[in-house]
Amino acid sequence: MRLFALLPVLLGLISSHFVSATDNGKTTDVTWDKYSLSVKGERVYVFSGEFHYQRLPVPELWLDVFQKLRANGFNAISIYFFWSFHSASEDTFDFENGAHDVQRVFDYAKQAGLYVIARAGPYCNAETSAGGFALWASNGQMGSTRTSASSYYDRWYPWIQEIGKIIAANQITNGGPVILNQHENELQETIHSADNTVVKYMEQIKAAFSDAGIIVPSTHNEKGMRSMSWSTDYQDVGGAVNIYGLDSYPGGLSCTNPNSGFNLVRTYYQWFQNYSSSQPEYLPEFEGGWFSAWGGSFYDQCSTELSPEFADVYYKNNIGSRVTLHNIYMVMGATSWGQSAAPVVYTSYDYSAPMRETREIRDKLKQTKLIGLFTRVSSGLLQTQMEGNGTGYTSDASIYTWALRNPETHAGFYVLAHSTSSSRAVTTTSLNVNTSAGALTIPNIELAGRQSKIIVTDYQTGDGSSLLYSSAEVLTYATLDVDVIVFYLNIGQKGEFAFKDAPTHLTFKTYGNSKVSSAKSDHGTKYTYCQGDGTTVLKFSHGVLVYLLDKETAWNFFAVPTTSNPRVAPSEQILALGPYLVRTASVSGHTVSLVGDNANATSLEVYTGNSKVTQIKWNGKETPTKKTAYGSLIGSAPGAEHAKLSLPTLKSWKAQDTLPEINPDYDDSRWTVCNKTTSVNSVAPLTLPVLYSGDYGYHAGTKIYRGRFDGVTATGANITVQNGVAAGWAAWLNGVYVGGAIGDPDLAATSAELEFTSSTLRRKDNVLTVVMDYTGHDQANVKPNGSQNPRGILGATLLGGDFTSWRIQGNAGGEANIDPVRGPMNEGGLYGERLGWHLPGYKGSKTATSESPLDGVSGAAGRFYTTTFKLDLDSDLDVPIGLQLGASADAPAVVQIFMNGYQFGHYLPHIGPQTRFPFPPGVINNRGENTLAISLWALTEQGARLSQVDLVAYGAYRTGFNFNHDWSYLQPQWENNRGQYV
């Protein structure tokens, strides 16, 4: 490493607080010091959100998400690259087909104006199957994972080389958006020794990324305050990264008890001082929500986790702790479609994130925007020292304060919240602050329950104005033709502010319903008001314009960047107020053009700072425009409240048997013979031959086994199956149901003793068929072998005889990846899946019946239902559409939903909780024909049926974003070559 001066130092003006920046010896485009990260020589507050492109398999929608994040104050995204998604078999990698084309991730991020933090593992966790390890490698052949073992290294190294080259080409040094690269994921350094295998592993990763050409700084994410790992400032014996990070999920919230948890962690600052004091404080994963497990609560029920108060209190607490790199996990969770989920989650990965699984903006994201826009312009926040903290700063000891000070500009940032952060008390207090004008007491600061405020002092608000202090929170400011300051408060709360070095005899005019008064003080004129409903604007005689917004009005305020640079200067913004979303804004001649979305028609106020601009265009159409006395433009933005959303009733179903393998005479001669007597897996099988599905090249989805034996003396069989928690299975002897297990959300493996009767036995060629559901491969923390815990049958013992043979069938082609667009985890081994009945273009057999899923099946059996329907939504609408299912919880069953070939729903009605399954545009055709397929098999003789199968709309938005593409490249059609996989 080497040191160089980050900022030019004027002779004779060298500050005692000057800190040189550190680089990694490979590039000076990204540097750091103990305060913040710098990109291209400028400090930046990294306000980032976690997004997983694999969970939204429509590349065009990545730009939709990125634009929404940029509009809501984010300047970066953090992205996992899952090895499992790109590698179906050893030495094969797909970075081209459909959503596997990761170059588009980088291109869209750059277009939207977002930095990228790359996280390629090789292990990722992320509640994805096998934690992101390629499933072909997760059958045990990696040996001792996450160590320096050669068996592991030989498998992950090619992955890092392939994805690493793409990341390298998109580094900021090459004009791309990548500024940081993470090594591994939450890997604890429990033994600080250069000879330790985990330390050697981290050195291997460092070398591998370097071999791939990556030169931006490296990072890692500590798994909570559980160990001290990979910091150059603490027992560095090897494997350390450039910038240490700490993951934290402190909420402790409950979906069923809104009064639980909500306890802030106030020890981050000390932790970073102890273990990474020379580096900026970085939270690579901070709670944006939490995942939900099989049998738990659905995300929409988790009101506390979804609350905007969570974002307000927790994210501001991080600012008070001096964090300047802040990544929210997840900012949008999306969907664990196909067989990509780890067993700990069901299909939805909504995560209670600020952005809904359906790409809709929650109030939680709107509140987060208030913080993001503040950090964007608050340059003084990027170089602060901890002046103090505790309950002694306010007149009420129930309030806790963080006090930060910029040693060069002397700007102060006081972050207030209730000392008992879960408190719902409404408290009014005064705050003692230090300013350039001396010590002051700011009165009448009200904190509602679960509210936090950032009080600023000596805060620059433009080229010609500064605030001496303000008890109203700063949302943002802009330096346009005049300095524009935007404040926000809850309705009814009092605000007070004073300018620094303002002209004497300053006057102002008020536009709006908040009454503002001025009074002389020892430190100039102070302005006080009580926040009314909506917007009030103050126009001061020295040119400054002040917007006073109530909080919920502020949720619909946008400071739209006029640059694609993630670092936005206060002068590079157009201010807009009113709509649900403003994506972009630009000025041409006399017109300001805005592109955005609206659910309901709203007013639209725009401030450009350009007196020549007299006309507003919204989504390409002029809107009647008038000019206000303070220089803004007023128009309107239409909504979708009157849009006709006519979703068809699903009918004209075709049904076929999807478990013909139950029939003992079914021809399985093309199936894979299970004849191995040893396994690559270190977990020994309970019986032989080995019946682990991974040993035979079948990894994701349903598996079917057929065991044979002769004679009539067998009384039963002991079968143990392991296919993930909640995964059930069923068995048939010679076509007769003999038992199984319905699945348990607490058990990954289940056993059953199947009972045979003489009437079901044959003298020759008895066939035991075992069909099993699959909920994913485990993550690394699951004993005994983590991501390599075997799947399939662990043991099969015939009582009163011996099996003579076993065969297995899984997804069509196994590791061949015969559908590279949808990828290696989309399909399982059900007969209908293998033959492609779920794919567009499949017309159905002549023997298909007209039954629907509402008819269901009698007894332990399975059916595959298909239908088609057309949608013709307005071209300027974004309508998230899903499928609502219902079924009795007393009839155990396994249901899968396929939309245009994509498995976008795994429904277990007896376990739950998910019953509604959304489809993004591109998976569903909002303007065109769609193929819907549903597989249903009953786990018991009770049979099963669905009680509801309906298309539903989550919302409707008039939009300027183009959702009308030819999606055919994402929806390969059925081909008449699937018969080989019977």
From Swiss-Prot:
<dbReference type="Pfam" id="PF01301">
    <property type="entry name" value="Glyco_hydro_35"/>
</dbReference>
<keyword id="KW-0732">Signal</keyword>
<keyword id="KW-1015">Disulfide bond</keyword>
<dbReference type="InterPro" id="IPR008979">
    <property type="entry name" value="Galactose-bd-like_sf"/>
</dbReference>
<dbReference type="GO" id="GO:0000272">
    <property type="term" value="P:polysaccharide catabolic process"/>
</dbReference>
<keyword id="KW-0119">Carbohydrate metabolism</keyword>
<feature type="glycosylation site" description="N-linked (GlcNAc...) asparagine">
    <location>
        <position position="600"/>
    </location>
</feature>
<feature type="signal peptide">
    <location>
        <begin position="1"/>
        <end position="21"/>
    </location>
</feature>
<dbReference type="InterPro" id="IPR025300">
    <property type="entry name" value="BetaGal_jelly_roll_dom"/>
</dbReference>
<feature type="glycosylation site" description="N-linked (GlcNAc...) asparagine">
    <location>
        <position position="434"/>
    </location>
</feature>
<dbReference type="Pfam" id="PF13364">
    <property type="entry name" value="BetaGal_ABD2"/>
</dbReference>
<feature type="glycosylation site" description="N-linked (GlcNAc...) asparagine">
    <location>
        <position position="718"/>
    </location>
</feature>
<feature type="binding site">
    <location>
        <position position="127"/>
    </location>
    <ligand>
        <name>substrate</name>
    </ligand>
</feature>
<feature type="binding site">
    <location>
        <position position="185"/>
    </location>
    <ligand>
        <name>substrate</name>
    </ligand>
</feature>
<keyword id="KW-0624">Polysaccharide degradation</keyword>
<feature type="glycosylation site" description="N-linked (GlcNAc...) asparagine">
    <location>
        <position position="389"/>
    </location>
</feature>
<feature type="binding site">
    <location>
        <position position="351"/>
    </location>
    <ligand>
        <name>substrate</name>
    </ligand>
</feature>
<dbReference type="InterPro" id="IPR018954">
    <property type="entry name" value="Betagal_dom2"/>
</dbReference>
<feature type="glycosylation site" description="N-linked (GlcNAc...) asparagine">
    <location>
        <position position="785"/>
    </location>
</feature>
<feature type="active site" description="Nucleophile">
    <location>
        <position position="285"/>
    </location>
</feature>
<feature type="binding site">
    <location>
        <position position="80"/>
    </location>
    <ligand>
        <name>substrate</name>
    </ligand>
</feature>
<dbReference type="GO" id="GO:0005576">
    <property type="term" value="C:extracellular region"/>
</dbReference>
<feature type="glycosylation site" description="N-linked (GlcNAc...) asparagine">
    <location>
        <position position="675"/>
    </location>
</feature>
<keyword id="KW-0326">Glycosidase</keyword>
<comment type="function">
    <text>Cleaves beta-linked terminal galactosyl residues from gangliosides, glycoproteins, and glycosaminoglycans.</text>
</comment>
<feature type="binding site">
    <location>
        <position position="125"/>
    </location>
    <ligand>
        <name>substrate</name>
    </ligand>
</feature>
<dbReference type="GO" id="GO:0004565">
    <property type="term" value="F:beta-galactosidase activity"/>
</dbReference>
<dbReference type="InterPro" id="IPR037110">
    <property type="entry name" value="Betagal_dom2_sf"/>
</dbReference>
<dbReference type="InterPro" id="IPR031330">
    <property type="entry name" value="Gly_Hdrlase_35_cat"/>
</dbReference>
<feature type="binding site">
    <location>
        <position position="126"/>
    </location>
    <ligand>
        <name>substrate</name>
    </ligand>
</feature>
<protein>
    <recommendedName>
        <fullName>Probable beta-galactosidase C</fullName>
        <ecNumber>3.2.1.23</ecNumber>
    </recommendedName>
</protein>
<comment type="similarity">
    <text>Belongs to the glycosyl hydrolase 35 family.</text>
</comment>
<dbReference type="Pfam" id="PF10435">
    <property type="entry name" value="BetaGal_dom2"/>
</dbReference>
<keyword id="KW-0325">Glycoprotein</keyword>
<dbReference type="InterPro" id="IPR017853">
    <property type="entry name" value="Glycoside_hydrolase_SF"/>
</dbReference>
<feature type="active site" description="Proton donor">
    <location>
        <position position="186"/>
    </location>
</feature>
<dbReference type="Pfam" id="PF13363">
    <property type="entry name" value="BetaGal_dom3"/>
</dbReference>
<dbReference type="InterPro" id="IPR036833">
    <property type="entry name" value="BetaGal_dom3_sf"/>
</dbReference>
<feature type="binding site">
    <location>
        <position position="249"/>
    </location>
    <ligand>
        <name>substrate</name>
    </ligand>
</feature>
<dbReference type="InterPro" id="IPR025972">
    <property type="entry name" value="BetaGal_dom3"/>
</dbReference>
<feature type="glycosylation site" description="N-linked (GlcNAc...) asparagine">
    <location>
        <position position="274"/>
    </location>
</feature>
<keyword id="KW-0964">Secreted</keyword>
